Amino acid sequence: MTVKPALGVWAHIPSARWAARVVDQAARVLPPLDGVGHRRVRLTDCDADWIQAHNADLHSVVLYLHGGGFLTGGLNTHRRLASRISQSADASVLSVNYRLMPTHAIGDAVADGIAGYRWLLARGFSPTQIVISGDSAGGYLAFMVALALADLDLPRPAGLVALSPLTDLDPTVKLQHPASARCPILPSSALVALTALTERVEHRTRGVSGLPFSPVNADLRGLPPVLLQVGSRDMLYPDARLMFECLTDAGVPVALEVWDGQFHVFHVAADLLPEARRAIEHVAEFIRVVTTVQNGDSAPDPLDSDREIA
């Protein structure tokens, strides 16, 4: 793995912009997935990718928010993963190139996700056709966008899919969990540096002290059905587990899949890992199920609520 050493270096100079530029530019060399097309669209304050597998219909659509610690990642880094979801779920995908720290606050990224949701509604998609999804920091954004919709009097989506999600910006529990030492992708030092940088950005942009609000601390009642996937060797395993418990307590239909031996956002390695391809198929099945439910009906449970997967 080369990601963990690179993040370890970044932890010592977290305000540097090189990481975002290098990662996104390097990802431009990744070949497109066969049978999938994409085109650039413009949202209010950022761009997005409109991704469609050649077999995709207009029955369902995924609003996708990429990971990258709110600092890096983008349309290039996550195009193949978003394309696989489109292909597997027979769905279109709107992948949002949301604004990043340190120039922008996390709240700006949430606003960009909301703009993506409005874009879909404006083009005639029913909320019962829309699933909001994200990985890592994008998982945080997926929940925060969904929570914001009710405050804006916007209809809730059909479902949420969170892959290796960050759901608690407080790093304390994660750093104390055994998974922090086992994770081959995220070093503890990077998590500590990200927390400190987030606090500085919040103070500079909003004039407030402390971290932004976390999904695990929210009133989750009324959220649509949720699928959580995480690897057993993922630094963010505790976040996925805690979010599962919070959603269960709130009465939200939720399924948690823990993939044994897998690392942070292992889905991006679908070209090499059969487990990643299986996980994406589970995501696709969830999308198909929740988007076929009619308005006012209860969604069937497509997966066991909590299970380990070898």
Predicted regions and their residues:
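A fold-wide structural signal in alpha/beta-hydrolase
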Residues: 61, 90-94
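Alpha/beta-hydrolase active-site loop signature
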Residues: 69, 98-105, 167, 263
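Alpha/beta hydrolase fold serine-hydrolase catalytic domain that processes acyl esters and thioesters
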Residues: 143-310
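Gly/Ala-rich beta-loop-alpha elbow adjacent to hydrolase catalytic centers
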Residues: 134, 138, 142
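Short beta-strand element of the alpha/beta-hydrolase
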Residues: 59-69
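A glycine/proline-hinged amphipathic helix-loop "lid/cap" segment
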Residues: 1-56, 204, 292-310
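Proline/glycine-enriched tight loop/beta-turn segments at coil->beta junctions
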Residues: 53-61, 221-223
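Catalytic nucleophile-loop/oxyanion-hole region of alpha/beta-hydrolase
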Residues: 74-75, 81, 94-129, 270-276
